[in-house]
Design a protein with these regions (language model features):
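Conserved donor-binding/catalytic core segment of Leloir-type glycosyltransferases
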Residues: 4, 190, 235-261, 273-275
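Aromatic "clamp/platform" in nucleotide-sugar-dependent glycosyltransferases that forms part
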Residues: 323
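Conserved acidic donor-binding segment of nucleotide-sugar-dependent glycosyltransferases
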Residues: 355-356, 360-367, 376-382
Length: 431
C-alpha cells in the first residue's frame, strides 16, 4: 500500500511529531509498503513565519525507506509578527458561531504551501492520508480536502496542548472551530492520552472514531549513556537535576531554574543541566541571572544525542514542568534509565505521569511546588529509586515504539480493510 504522511517539520528536524511519523513510516517501509512524507522546507519552526530562520535545502530525499517531499513555505507580505497577530484574530473569531468557513480561509493566508496543490494535482494515488499537529492547520486542511476527493481514509493526530486546568489561553490555539470541525470530519483521530480524547469528545469529536495511543521510545536507542563521562566532562560532583527540551517558559525551563535557585538558597549542592534549543526570551532571562546561579548550571544548547544519553545516565532527577506537552517522550527516556521525573499538572502530562507512583506533578509555574518535588526526590533516595523503577517498568510494558506502532497499524488496517472492496482492492498488498 501507499501511505501519505503530512507533517510540517520532518527529518532532519528533531521534533516530537516528526519522530512519531518517522517511527510509524519507517516501520511501514520495512514491511514493504510505500510511504511518502509531505513536509515543509522549514528547519526551525519560526521559519514558517520568519524567513530569516533556517530551512532545509533538499527538496526531496529518501530517509529510512521513506520518501520525503519538502514544499517551500510562502508567507504573506510583512514582518514576522503578522503570523501571531493573524492567529490571535482567528482565536477571537472562533468565539463567534458559524465562523468555520472564514477561519479555514484565514488559516491558509500565511504560511502557505502553493506547491501542495500541484503535488495533489499530479494524480499520485494513496491508500490512506495521515496528518498531524492541528495548530499548524495550513498543511492539514488541504490534505483533508485531497483525501476526500481521492476517496482515501483520513487520519489526524492533532497533538493538542491542553494547557493548565481551567485556563484556555493555550488550548484555544488548538481548538478553534475550524480545527475541531476538521477532527469531526476525520475518519480517525489518534489522541496522545485519554485526557486529550475526553477534551475532544466534549467538543463533539465522535468518541467511536478516536483512539488514545500516545508515543513511545526504543529502549535500545536510548541506552548506552555514560554518566561518569558526563560528570567528568561537565564538572558535576554532587546530585544532578536534568532538564531536556526546548528552553522556553512554556516548557518549564525558566521555572526549573527558579525552583533550583530556591533549593540552592536552602543549602542544596545539586547541579542543574539544561539541554535544548534556547528561544530568545530564555536567552534574555539566562543572561540576567547572577553569576552564582550560572555557576551551578550546565547550559548545553543543541547537545548531540550522545551527550543527552550521558546526561540521562548521570541524572538523579529529571524535571520538565511543561504546559505544552501533549505527551512528553523525554519523560520516557528518563524512565529508561530509572530516573524519577517531575512534570507539571498541565497538558497531557497527567495522563503520562502517575503522581506518586512513577513521578511527581506540580502546578505549572509554581516554583515553590516544583522545588518541593525536586527537593523531595533528592532527599529521599528510596522514593526516587521506587518511582524511577516504576516508570521504567511502565515504559517496557506499554510505551515502546513497537507497541505504539502496532496500535497505529491497527487503525490503518481498520480503515483500509473497510475501503478495500471499493476500487482496486485486488491489486493492493494488504497490511
Amino acid at each position: 500500500m501507499h501511505f501519505l504522511h503530512v507533517v510540517q517539520l520532518y527529518y532532519p528536524v528533531n521534533t516530537g511529531a516528526g519522530r512519531y511519523f518517522a517511527e510509524v513510516g519507517e516501520r511501514l517501509a520495512r514491511e514493504g509498503h510505500r510511504v511518502t512524507v509531505l513536509a515543509t522546507d522549514a528547519y526551525d519552526l519560526e521559519y514558517l513565519w520568519n524567513p530569516a530562520r533556517r530551512r532545509v535545502a533538499a527538496p526531496e530525499e529518501v530517509h529510512g525507506g521513506v520518501r520525503i517531499v519538502r514544499l517551500p513555505v510562502r508567507r504573506a507580505p510583512g514582518p514576522p509578527i503578522v503570523y501571531p497577530i493573524l492567529r490571535r484574530l482567528m482565536v477571537e473569531l472562533s468565539r463567534l458561531p458559524r465562523t468555520e468557513p472564514l477561519l479555514r480561509r484565514l488559516a491558509l493566508v500565511t504560511p502557505r504551501l502553493p506547491a501542495m496543490r500541484r503535488f495533489f494535482a499530479a494524480g499520485e494515488r494513496f491508500d490512506l492520508v495521515h496528518a498531524g499537529n492541528i495548530t499548524l492547520d495550513f498543511a492539514i486542511l488541504p490534505a483533508l480536502d485531497f483525501a476526500r476527493r481521492a476517496g482515501a481514509p483520513f487520519v489526524c493526530t492533532p497533538f493538542v496542548h491542553l494547557g493548565e486546568p481551567g485556563d484556555g489561553s493555550l488550548s484555544r490555539y488548538y481548538l478553534m472551530r475550524h480545527q475541531v470541525d476538521l477532527l469531526r470530519r476525520s475518519d480517525r483521530v489518534i489522541a496522545m492520552t485519554s485526557l486529550e480524547a475526553d477534551a475532544l469528545a466534549a467538543r463533539g469529536v465522535p468518541p467511536e472514531r478516536m483512539r488514545a495511543i500516545g508515543v513511545g521510545v526504543d529502549p535500545r536507542e536510548v541506552a548506552g549513556g555514560d554518566g561518569a563521562r558526563f560528570r567528568a566532562q561537565h564538572t558535576v560532583a554532587g546530585p544532578l537535576v536534568l532538564y531536556v527540551g526546548a528552553l522556553a517558559r512554556d516548557k518549564g525551563a525558566i521555572h526549573t531554574i527558579e525552583a533550583m535557585r530556591r533549593l540552592w538558597e536552602a543549602g542544596s549542592d545539586a547541579t542543574l543541566a539544561l539541554i535544548g534549543a534556547p528561544l530568545a526570551h530564555f536567552t534574555e532571562f539566562y543572561e540576567r541571572l547572577p553569576a552564582a546561579a550560572k555557576a551551578r548550571i550546565r547550559l548545553l544548547p543543541y547537545a548531540p544525542d550522545e551527550v543527552k544519553r550521558d546526561a540521562l545516565a548521570a541524572a538523579d532527577v529529571f524535571a520538565m514542568p511543561s504546559r505544552t506537552d501533549s505527551f512528553g517522550i523525554v519523560y520516557l527516556e528518563a524512565w529508561c534509565y530509572g530516573v524519577p521525573v517531575v512534570g507539571a499538572r498541565a497538558g497531557g502530562v497527567p495522563g503520562v505521569i502517575a503522581d506518586g507512583q512513577d513521578g511527581l506533578l506540580a502546578p505549572y509555574g509554581d516554583t515553590a511546588a516544583i522545588a518541593g518535588a525536586v527537593g523531595r526526590l533528592l532527599a529521599d533516595r528510596e522514593l526516587a529509586r521506587r518511582l524511577g523503577a516504576a516508570g521504567r517498568a511502565k515504559v517496557l510494558r506499554e510505551l515502546t515504539w513497537d507497541r505504539i506502532y502496532s496500535q497505529v497499524r491497527q487503525v490503518y488496517e481498520e480503515l483500509t480493510e473497510r475501503r478495500a472492496p471499493r476500487a482496486h482492492s485486488e491489486t493492493r498488498p494488504g497490511l
